[in-house]
Amino acid sequence: MICAVDCGVAVNPDVIAAQMEGGIGFGLGAALYGAITLKDGHVEQSNFDSYQVLRIDKMPKVEVYIVPSTEAPTGVGEPGVAPIGPAVANAAFAATGKRHRVLPFSAAGTA
């Protein structure tokens, strides 16, 4: 997986890379498995035995490119979270020709 981030002057590139990797991991887990279901008014997934998360052995290698900039540092936040679902959906479309429009993908039987 490859990502790029433009956050102004990179004060600490290692922290920026770690933040992007973590955001991508969180977003990927949510896109693949993040279903929350209710039964009789209660959440069925009460702990990690019933709520699937992305495990470390399923985390892809992430290459982080920091865009060189002379702008003031802006902070990194979680920019890796939001685009990962659409990126995976587009990759699946490129591979299969089928559009996936429901998240998590596991809810549609495609994860």
What are these regions (language model features)?
Residues 1-111:
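Cofactor-binding beta-sheet edge motifs in enzyme active sites
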